[in-house]
């Protein structure tokens, strides 16, 4: 006598998927979700990088959501002019705000320290506050973490009323929610050794 166990299959559809990988891995994942016909949000933290919206294409529209410090369709902020000037000068898209913050804050810390000595600059960075163009950005003194506002945005067709595209495509980012810098502060256990 052979006994067969036939468990009942339970098929569920998740309410969302989270994926943290850069470009090619994420693009393959997002396309697979689209091709499978899963109508779920796909959250990631790298979809805004140059080349990704173009590679994802229609598979990401209304589905891919990313966390970022800025995107071009945030109207009314000084970064819009910076964005347009960058495109005019370099003939390519720009969307990676941490680069701008790093350069601006580092230059300001050198000026504040009155020197390029790494120790002097490191101390000048501690507690440094800066208008990042979409809100205050600051360097937490305890662990040198950059605290800044974040946006959760969804990839949409520009025909849905978006002013700017991403990657010179027909797709752009549309804000779902802004998370203020104060809401991004998490406790830490860092104990930096200072010179």
Spans of features found by a protein language model:
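Extracellular/periplasmic Venus flytrap/periplasmic-binding protein
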Residues: 1-37, 72-81
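Solvent-exposed, polar/charged alpha-helical surfaces in well-ordered, non-transmembrane soluble domains
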Residues: 2-6, 27, 31, 84, ...
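Active-site lining segments that contact anionic ligands and/or coordinate catalytic metals
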Residues: 14, 39, 61, 134, ...
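Active-site-proximal beta-strand/loop segments in catalytic clefts of secreted hydrolases
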Residues: 19-23, 45-48, 67-71, 143, ...
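Extracellular/periplasmic periplasmic-binding protein-like sensory domains
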Residues: 30-102, 111-116, 165, 170-194
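A bilobed periplasmic-binding-protein/Venus flytrap-type ligand-binding module shared by bacterial periplasmic
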Residues: 106-109, 154-156
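Short, well-structured alpha-helical segments that form the helix of a local strand-helix-strand
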Residues: 117-134
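Solvent-exposed, acidic/polar segments of extracytosolic/periplasmic ligand-binding ectodomains
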Residues: 129, 133-195
């Amino acid at each position: 006598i052979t006994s067969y166990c036939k468990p009942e299959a339970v098929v569920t559809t998740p309410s969302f998927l989270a994926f943290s990988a850069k470009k090619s891995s994420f693009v393959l994942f997002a396309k697979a979700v689209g091709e499978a016909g899963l109508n779920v949000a796909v959250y990631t933290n790298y979809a805004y990088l140059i080349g990704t919206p173009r590679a994802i294409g229609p598979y990401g529209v209304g589905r891919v959501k990313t966390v970022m410090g800025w995107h071009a369709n945030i109207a009314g902020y000084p970064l819009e002019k910076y964005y347009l000037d960058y495109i005019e000068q370099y003939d390519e898209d720009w969307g990676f705000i941490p680069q701008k913050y790093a350069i601006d804050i580092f230059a300001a810390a050198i000026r504040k320290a009155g020197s390029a000595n790494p120790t002097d600059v490191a101390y000048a960075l501690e507690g440094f506050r800066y208008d990042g163009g979409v809100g205050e950005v600051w360097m937490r003194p305890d662990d040198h973490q950059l605290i800044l506002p974040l946006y959760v945005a969804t990839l949409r067709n520009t025909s849905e009323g978006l002013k700017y595209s991403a990657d010179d495509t027909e797709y752009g980012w549309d804000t779902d929610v802004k998370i203020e810098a104060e809401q991004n502060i998490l406790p830490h256990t860092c104990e930096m050794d200072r010179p």
